[in-house]
């Protein structure tokens, strides 16, 4: 009951054990029927890391086994060496940024609104009033008043009244209609494509995931690095012919689709230059085999810029230029098996960069791209000046209202000046300095925790620390009064907890030390006879409570990478039998606290007496002394952390009532003072495991146990976040554009100028420094391994990029020319994240034929014209994988054979283990920006802009002439006197 629990020993397997070591890779056979799953071999010792053997075909999954008990973890399989990374393909040159379209001319000003009508004239002043009646005649002698004389004549009209105040201003006339829109400005020509920014250094390599579930198909043979762009001449035909592809290395394991072929620069057609290196925009080629590129061809002539074509579509747009003849392939790395995923290998150094091929001659310019998008309409021109406001005339006498003044005419719009010539192209801007290598990408997120490996071997439980001798049971004092309850000292010793299965690195649990203030409730010490509870001294049979064996030093937190193998769950120590509670005597009167007697040897726990009623709660006595800590038990091997046993119920603390009379136990004598702690004797046998108390604090970590062999690989974590792309170096300054002359009269759009010839290729940027490898992320879980797809034949060409490719010379003999001198590496493009596996296409036919021998380095032959596209070859049977020969010298680029029709996309092969990510190179410097092309003729006049705001009110018109005086009215009749 209290002894060791041997459940930690290996039990019959419940979960699948680790995979056995993989055998060497066989040649790829036809996919056979999946074999049955082999038996699991016993775990071997961890071997030296072997070379990764080829992956065997994956057997079908067996029926799920019963959950066995955890087996012993087998050794981790050796880590295969990472395959050599293919050379990075060159990144296509980025199309130049187009020049901005010319701004449309300002629209003609809208006509001015007609001035409002002149306000009505004021009313004429009143006529003079009729004069007052003359004085009455003198009275007659009889005093009678004579008749009132006739009214005097109407006084003449008074002077004209002041002119009436000007009538209110006429309302503003309606806003003139917006002048007709001027014709649209000519479409801005498409600017020259901007120079591609320097290729940023590739983001840090994503972590290599362990291979887990079927990864995506192997990394594409790294696409050959694009040849470094030659110094950019003035971008000539914007779409140069595709440069020769570098020699391609042998296909790596079928990877996911390679990056799209470099995009040719779309542009307007320059005159056809000699074929150059930039390819017509390729469809996404099959995964290019990376190879070294051929030697740099002479730069093409620098043509004037063609008109700007529409920007080529990304990626899949044109057909990739014919593939260069296949140079000697670099040896394909042997495909490592997707073995057990070992821990990720250290990143291999990046394979040597292939030398960049020389840029081929500038290819014929593509046709002129369609006109660029129309420039945006110019802003509305300023509103024409309002017609001059007439001067105010003198205020005449008010006359009849004059006619409304004419509306002021809108001033005529001046003709637009002729456009000045475009300034000569400014000198090419210098290349921007190489940007510093991008920051190291953020470390990928932590991979998800793989499934726990099988538990490590369970360490044998260390010997239990010797249990101190049990003190002798003190004699039961007479139950004095309940002393004040001491702080709950260590509760009666929890019998030394039976060792919980050797808990991982916790050393064997020594005797439980004082669990700090109120230690976890141990077994509720026997409420035994509630003796003088004074100090809950070493009640019960526990000797001095040993310290809890120091919890083994917790192994350092493993890297949080792969989750450490979860050791076996140690068996939870069985709970010792709970000591039976002593009988609680009936509460007696609280006696005085007796002296604590010496602790006698612990007697066996008596049978539980009936629980006494609660005694009175005495005052809290002083805490008993802590027992000495027993020596720490030897640290067991770290097993997996035992599962936590269920926490035993915490003994209920009875209400401490008044101490009742002790029951069947004799009357307790007063507790004597505590005797000195006895020396720690040899550990008695472990007591029964009490119910687990509350967990004590974790002690200092014990020494790490022996690490069990690694478990099978965990499930692959998610791929770490891709590091941010390195900063792009600053783009070289664009040559300054000469100042534009004044806009010319809008003419018909002239024909596009002749495209200039392509400028010489820019010089290659320096080879980037390798960035530090990114941190490897945990591998994703390995998926089912698909059969490797046969590399598809070259697919049919997609639509050509804008502009037909110039004719290429006839293709030379198909055999590889002797390798030329390798060009320098271009900057590696950043790796895109691995593409998802596409739906498997039909398997392309693999052309038969062995690669020709690598010739000695010959001079590069001239590019022949592009031959007609070859038909699909019949699918040869895949030959057995030969061993990789040494890499031959890179031959010069042979003439490109005709571009084969693009085969159906091969089925995606398994994603091979992810090769080590090469360190990112520094971004090459930009080629110089080509000079801007000449300004095209001014386009037609843009539509009129919106009308401007209504003009201010016109000035008041001159007053009209004073009309003739009206006819004098007839005299009114005399009013009554």
Swiss-Prot record:
Comp. bias (Low complexity): 17-66, 138-159, 205-226, 268-278, 322-338, 373-392, 497-514, 526-536, 569-605, 620-640, 658-668, 689-698, 752-779, 787-797, 853-871, 878-898
Other observations noted: These protein fragments were extracted from an ancient femur bone collected at Cueva Rosello in Peru.
SUBUNIT field: Trimers of one alpha 2(I) and two alpha 1(I) chains. Interacts (via C-terminus) with TMEM131 (via PapD-L domain); the interaction is direct and is involved in assembly and TRAPPIII ER-to-Golgi transport complex-dependent secretion of collagen.
One GO CC term, this protein: extracellular region
Protein name: Collagen alpha-2(I) chain
Secreted listed as a keyword: yes
Protein's job: Type I collagen is a member of group I collagen (fibrillar forming collagen).
Keyword Magnesium: no
Tissues/organs with expression: Expressed in bones.
Broad class of where this protein is predominantly found: secreted
Location(s) in or outside the cell: Secreted; Secreted, Extracellular space; Secreted, Extracellular space, Extracellular matrix
Transmembrane segments: none
Biased composition (Gly residues): 258-267, 300-309, 441-450, 537-546, 678-687, 735-744, 798-817
Basic and acidic residues bias locations: 641-650, 902-913
UniProt KW keywords: Extinct organism protein, Extracellular matrix, Glycoprotein, Hydroxylation, Secreted
Residues carrying a glycan: 91
Record-stated family: Belongs to the fibrillar collagen family.
In-chain residues carrying the UniProt-annotated modification 5-hydroxylysine: 91
Region ranges (Disordered): 1-977
Modified residues (4-hydroxyproline): 10, 13, 28, 34, 344, 347
PTM per Swiss-Prot/TrEMBL: Prolines at the third position of the tripeptide repeating unit (G-X-Y) are hydroxylated in some or all of the chains.
């Amino acid at each position: 009951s209290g002894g060791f629990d041997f459940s930690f020993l290996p039990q019959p397997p419940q979960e699948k054990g680790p995979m056995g070591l993989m055998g060497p890779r066989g040649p790829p056979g036809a996919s056979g029927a999946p074999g049955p799953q082999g038996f699991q071999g016993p775990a071997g010792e961890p071997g030296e890391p072997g070379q990764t053997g080829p992956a065997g075909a994956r057997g079908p999954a067996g029926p799920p086994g019963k959950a066995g008990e955890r087996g012993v973890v087998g050794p981790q399989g050796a880590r295969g060496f990472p395959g050599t990374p293919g050379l990075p393909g060159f990144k296509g040159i980025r199309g130049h940024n187009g020049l901005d379209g010319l701004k449309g001319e300002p629209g003609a000003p809208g006509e001015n609104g007609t001035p409002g009508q002149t306000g009505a004239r004021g009313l004429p002043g009143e006529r003079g009033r009729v004069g007052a009646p003359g004085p009455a005649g003198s009275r007659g002698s009889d005093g009678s008043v004579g008749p009132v004389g006739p009214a005097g004549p109407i006084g003449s009209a008074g002077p004209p009244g002041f002119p009436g105040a000007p009538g209110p201003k006429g309302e503003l006339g309606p806003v003139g209609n917006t002048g007709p829109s001027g014709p649209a400005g000519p479409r801005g020509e498409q600017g020259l494509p901007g120079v591609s920014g320097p290729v940023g250094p590739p983001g840090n390599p994503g972590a290599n995931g362990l291979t887990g579930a079927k990864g995506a198909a192997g990394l594409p043979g790294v696409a050959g690095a694009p040849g470094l762009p030659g110094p950019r001449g003035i971008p000539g035909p914007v779409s140069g012919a595709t440069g020769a592809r570098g020699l391609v290395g042998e296909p790596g394991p079928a990877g996911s689709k390679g990056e799209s072929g470099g995009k040719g620069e779309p542009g307007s057609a320059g005159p056809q230059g000699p074929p150059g290196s930039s390819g017509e925009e390729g469809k996404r080629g099959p995964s290019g085999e990376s190879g070294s590129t051929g030697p740099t061809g002479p730069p093409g002539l620098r043509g004037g810029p063609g008109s700007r074509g529409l920007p080529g579509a990304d990626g899949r747009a044109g057909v990739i230029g014919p593939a260069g003849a296949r140079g000697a392939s670099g040896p394909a790395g042997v495909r490592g098996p997707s073995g057990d995923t070992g821990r990720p290998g250290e990143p291999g150094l990046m394979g040597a960069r292939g030398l960049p091929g020389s840029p081929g001659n500038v290819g014929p310019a593509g046709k002129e791209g369609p006109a660029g998008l129309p420039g945006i309409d110019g802003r509305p021109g300023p509103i024409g000046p309002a017609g001059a406001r007439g001067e105010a005339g003198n205020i005449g006498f008010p006359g009849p209202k004059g006619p409304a003044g004419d509306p002021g005419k809108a001033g005529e719009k001046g003709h637009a000046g002729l456009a000045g010539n475009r300034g000569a192209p400014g000198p090419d801007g210098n290349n921007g300095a190489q940007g510093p290598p991008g920051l190291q990408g953020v470390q990928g997120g932590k991979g998800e925790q793989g499934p726990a490996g099988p538990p490590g071997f369970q360490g044998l439980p260390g010997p239990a620390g010797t249990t101190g001798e049990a003190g002798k049971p003190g004699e039961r004092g007479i139950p004095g009064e309940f002393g004040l309850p001491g702080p709950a000292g260590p509760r009666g010793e929890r019998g030394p907890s039976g060792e919980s299965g050797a808990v991982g690195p916790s050393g064997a649990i020594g005797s439980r030390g004082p669990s700090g203030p109120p230690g976890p409730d141990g077994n509720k010490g026997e409420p035994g006879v509630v003796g003088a509870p004074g100090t809950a001294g070493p009640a019960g049979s526990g000797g001095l409570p040993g310290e809890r064996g120091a919890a083994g030093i917790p192994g350092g937190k493993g890297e949080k990478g792969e989750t450490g193998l979860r050791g076996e769950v140690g068996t939870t120590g069985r709970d010792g039998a709970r000591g039976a509670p002593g009988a609680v005597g009936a509460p007696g009167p609280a006696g005085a606290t007796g002296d604590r007697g010496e602790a006698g040897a612990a007697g066996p726990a008596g049978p539980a007496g009936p629980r006494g009623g609660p005694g009175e709660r005495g005052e809290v006595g002083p805490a008993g002394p802590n027992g000495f800590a027993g020596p720490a038990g030897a640290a067991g091997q770290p097993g997996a952390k035992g599962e936590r046993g269920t926490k035993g119920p915490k003994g209920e603390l009875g209400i401490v009532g008044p101490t009742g009379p002790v029951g069947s136990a004799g009357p307790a004598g007063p507790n004597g003072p505590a005797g000195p702690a006895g020396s720690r004797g040899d550990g008695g046998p472990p007591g029964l495991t009490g119910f687990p108390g509350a967990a004590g604090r974790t002690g200092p970590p014990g020494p790490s146990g022996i690490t069990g062999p690694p478990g099978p690989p965990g499930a692959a974590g998610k791929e770490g976040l891709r590091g941010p792309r390195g900063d792009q170096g600053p783009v070289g300054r664009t040559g300054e554009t000469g100042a534009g002359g004044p806009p010319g009269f809008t003419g018909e759009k002239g024909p596009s100028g002749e495209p200039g010839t392509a400028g010489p290729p820019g010089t290659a940027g320096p080879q980037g420094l390798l960035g530090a490898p990114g941190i490897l992320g945990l591998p994703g879980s390995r998926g089912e391994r698909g059969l490797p797809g046969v590399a598809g034949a070259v697919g049919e060409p997609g639509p050509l990029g804008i502009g037909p490719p110039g004719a290429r010379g006839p293709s030379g003999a198909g055999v590889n020319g002797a390798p030329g001198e390798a060009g320098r590496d271009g900057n590696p493009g950043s790796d895109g994240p691995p593409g998802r596996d596409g739906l498997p296409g039909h398997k392309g036919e693999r052309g038969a034929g062995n690669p020709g021998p690598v010739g000695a380095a010959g001079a590069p032959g001239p590019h022949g014209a592009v031959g007609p596209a070859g038909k699909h070859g019949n699918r040869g049977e895949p030959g057995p994988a030969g061993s990789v020969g040494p890499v031959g010298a890179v031959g010069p680029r042979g003439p490109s054979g005709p571009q084969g029709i693009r085969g159906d996309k091969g089925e995606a092969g398994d994603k091979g283990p992810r090769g080590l990510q090469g360190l990112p190179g520094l971004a090459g410097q930009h080629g110089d920006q080509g000079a801007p092309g000449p300004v095209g003729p001014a386009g037609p006049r843009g539509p009129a802009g919106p009308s401007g705001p209504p003009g201010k009110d016109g000035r008041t018109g001159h007053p009209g002439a004073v009309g003739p005086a009206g006819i004098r009215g007839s005299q009114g009749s005399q009013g009554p006197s």
